[in-house]
Amino acid sequence: MQVMHPVCCGIDVHQKSIVCCILDGPLTSNEPKKYQTTFGTTTKELKAALDWILEHQVTHVFFESTGQYWIPLFNIFSDSDLELVLANPQHIKNVPGRKTDVKDAEWIAQLGRCGLINQSYIPSQEVLQLRYLTRYRLSVKQRLTQIKNHIHVILQRANIKITSYLTDIFC
């Protein structure tokens, strides 16, 4: 595989930790130096991860879009000059053999180093907030409907036939 990025970082993202693997070597080298470490996912720890990555003069950072866990990492890292590449997990084949977070991070770094990871769509902050609010509104409406239905059941079991007189008891 042809090397596209001499110094890059692959990150395996989880709820409570991120595993970073930096591959550093010339474009002609198939044996780059490897630096690996694990950080937590608090703001302070993510900033420490960013500092560690910048100390190694990384130019490209590759990570998977794992649930919502990638968003805090992206928010903190996007303030830097790093080229951030969010990968769809389905497009990154699993590591052959035994699966570990360290191997996953290295595999992501290797694929990214060779330019084999395509950038996923990253919505703007406004779109992300609108999606969140829309989903939240839908969940509130669904809960309200469940509560109303439950009240109807309670009234019927108590032989209170209020719905015979009112079309909507919640107006």
Task: Report residues per predicted region.
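Short, charge/polar-rich alpha-helical segments
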Residues: 131-139
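Nucleic-acid-processing active sites and adjacent nucleic-acid-binding tracks
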Residues: 27-60
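Glycine-rich, often acidic, oxyanion-interacting loops/wings at catalytic, nucleic-acid
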Residues: 138-171
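Gly/Thr-rich phosphate-binding beta-strand-loop-beta motif of the actin/hexokinase/Hsp70
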Residues: 2-25, 108
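Short, glycine/acidic-enriched loop or turn micro-motifs at the edges of active sites
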Residues: 15, 67, 91
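Short glycine-rich phosphate-binding loop at a beta-alpha junction
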Residues: 58-69
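Short alpha-helix plus adjacent loop in nuclease-associated cores
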Residues: 78, 84-132, 169-170
